[in-house]
Structure formats: C-alpha cells, structure tokens
C-alpha cells in the first residue's frame, strides 16, 4: 500500500498537504480507494463552504458503496477539482494526485497523522 511520507493524514482516510498558495489540498488515501473499489461519483464541498474538523463535508461513491468525506480541519473550501466530476476514476488510478478540494485552514493544522502514524493506524 502506498503511503507517501510527504503528506499528512486523518483517521478518516484523507490525505492533506499545503499547496503553493498557502491553501491545503485534500483527497482520499490509497487505502480508502482500495476499500471503495471503482469510484463513479464525487460530491465535493462547494467553494465557500465552512469546514468543521471531523464533520461530513462531501461524498465519494463507488460501484460497491458510498462513503462520507470528513473535514480534515476547520477552515473554508477554496476550490474543487472539477476534473473529478467528469473522471472520478482518477482517484483509483492516482489517489495522491487526484485532490478533491482545497481549503484554507482556520488556524495552524493540528491533530493530523504522519505517514508512520497512519501506517500504524491501518495495522
């Protein structure tokens, strides 16, 4: 299983990383996409949506099931990856390139997991 060292993670199987504009990108992990199977639909939170850490903010659906996206941190959504509306299967092919939404954190990020901590969570 692929767990890049340069990303941070949540217990709800999201990865996050800062982008060059000071916002953060969020997507689902390789583990999550593997459990879901073939992804057919992504409902990302709309730009301007207020995020509350740990609360549902979107949805990923596969041929097997649907899974809520949980906000990684408090903040505000700044953009969504429009390409995933047309080709959601990109998440299966490249989970760490296929970001779902970007957001501006309300405060300095805390409570995120390192790659080693996420790996330990998975067992």
Curated annotation (Swiss-Prot):
GO terms for biological process: glycine decarboxylation via glycine cleavage system. InterPro entries: Biotin_lipoyl, GCV_H, GCV_H/Fam206, GCV_H_sub, Single_hybrid_motif. Binds 1 lipoyl cofactor covalently. It comes from the Bacteria. The modification N6-lipoyllysine is found at residue 64. Keywords: Lipoyl. Its cofactor is (R)-lipoate. SUPFAM superfamilies: Single hybrid motif. Residues 23-104 form the Lipoyl-binding domain. One of its GO terms (cellular component) is glycine cleavage complex. Belongs to the GcvH family. The glycine cleavage system catalyzes the degradation of glycine. The H protein shuttles the methylamine group of glycine from the P protein to the T protein. The glycine cleavage system is composed of four proteins: P, T, L and H. This is Glycine cleavage system H protein. The lineage of its organism: Bacteria, Pseudomonadati, Pseudomonadota, Betaproteobacteria, Nitrosomonadales.
């Amino acid at each position: 299983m692929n767990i890049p060292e340069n990303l941070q993670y949540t217990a709800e199987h999201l990865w996050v990383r800062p982008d060059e504009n000071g916002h953060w990108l969020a997507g689902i992990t390789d583990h999550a996409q593997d459990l879901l199977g073939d992804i057919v639909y992504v409902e990302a939170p709309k730009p301007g949506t207020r995020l509350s850490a740990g609360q549902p903010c979107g949805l990923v659906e596969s041929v097997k099931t649907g899974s809520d996206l949980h906000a990684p941190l408090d903040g505000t959504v700044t953009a969504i990856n429009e390409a995933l509306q047309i080709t959601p299967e990109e998440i299966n092919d490249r989970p760490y390139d296929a970001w779902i939404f970007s957001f501006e954190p309300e405060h300095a990020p805390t409570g995120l997991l390192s790659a080693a901590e996420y790996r330990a969570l998975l067992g």
